[in-house]
Regions:
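Non-catalytic cap/lid and distal C-terminal segments of serine-dependent acyl enzymes
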Residues: 1-250
Length: 252
């Protein structure tokens, strides 16, 4: 299940998961048309995403899908280039060992061109990315590859949300919290890693945990997804400076 997949500890070196699997998935680059959602001008532009297809991808089967967002200074290709393609190897090994079912992973980017010098300057782009995903990237990806979306209009995306996840590291986690805040109708599963919820301002999850928790809870109560209609798996290493914000949020 998605819950088991997201909550399972990821141990890279144990059992040789950092090695190439015999059955290797493939990485596909996708350029797509979108708009400037961050600056409000609506100017047309092109963005890029990379897509992991599991070994033996079959057009006759349906696949769960996850959108995984990089951190600051990253790009759409970072996850599949870092550590000599470690993420692809890990996914291949986890599928081969039966830890997760074969699935599709999409790595988008909130950057256009060079990353911002200061990571807080990326905030408006992180906030805008979930809308770009729903309006532009999900329709392109999930009409080309066989997910559980029967259609890729707003209704079709919502109906298939229980088969769609979003996650990210650092500023990608900030993006994930924005997705929970603003596009809950498109995703059921959320995996923010080492990043704060900034819906009420920079570092609000750490500095204003009561207000942030209440804000997120109200968002859910006002939606159609209260109770079991969503799942959040948030994590941060204990030596990571971001861990303090998760400690505060978890307490609420």
């Amino acid at each position: 299940t998605w819950r088991q997949s997201l909550a399972r500890p990821l141990v890279l070196t144990l059992y040789g998961y950092e090695q190439e699997a015999e059955q290797r998935g493939s990485i596909v680059r996708m350029d797509y048309d979108t708009r400037d959602y961050a600056e409000g001008c609506g100017a047309s532009r092109t963005n890029t995403a990379y897509i992991y297809l599991p070994y033996g991808y079959d057009e006759q089967k349906r696949y769960n899908i996850m959108y995984l967002v990089h951190g600051h200074y990253g790009t759409a290709s970072t996850y599949f280039e870092t550590e000599n393609g470690m993420l692809r190897k890990l996914l291949d090994q986890m599928i081969a060992h039966g830890d997760i079912a074969p699935m599709i992973i999409v790595t988008p980017t909130y950057n256009y061109g060079q990353p911002t010098a200061n990571y807080t300057d990326a905030d408006p782009y992180c906030k805008a990315l979930p809308q770009e995903l729903v309006n532009d990237l999900i329709p392109v990806v999930e009409s080309r590859y066989h997910t559980y979306a029967e259609t890729t209009d707003a209704e079709g995306i919502e109906v298939s949300r229980k088969h769609r996840a979003i996650g990210g590291f650092s500023m990608g986690a900030v993006t994930t919290w924005y997705a929970f805040d603003e596009t809950l109708s498109a995703f059921k599963w959320f995996m923010p890693i080492s990043g704060d919820c900034w819906s009420l301002g920079w570092f609000a999850g750490m500095n204003r945990p009561d207000e942030t928790a209440a804000y997120l809870a109200d968002k859910v109560r006002q939606s159609a997804y209260a109770g079991t209609g969503f799942y959040i798996w948030a994590a941060s290493g204990t030596s990571d400076s971001a861990s303090v914000s998760y400690t505060h949020l978890r307490a609420h």
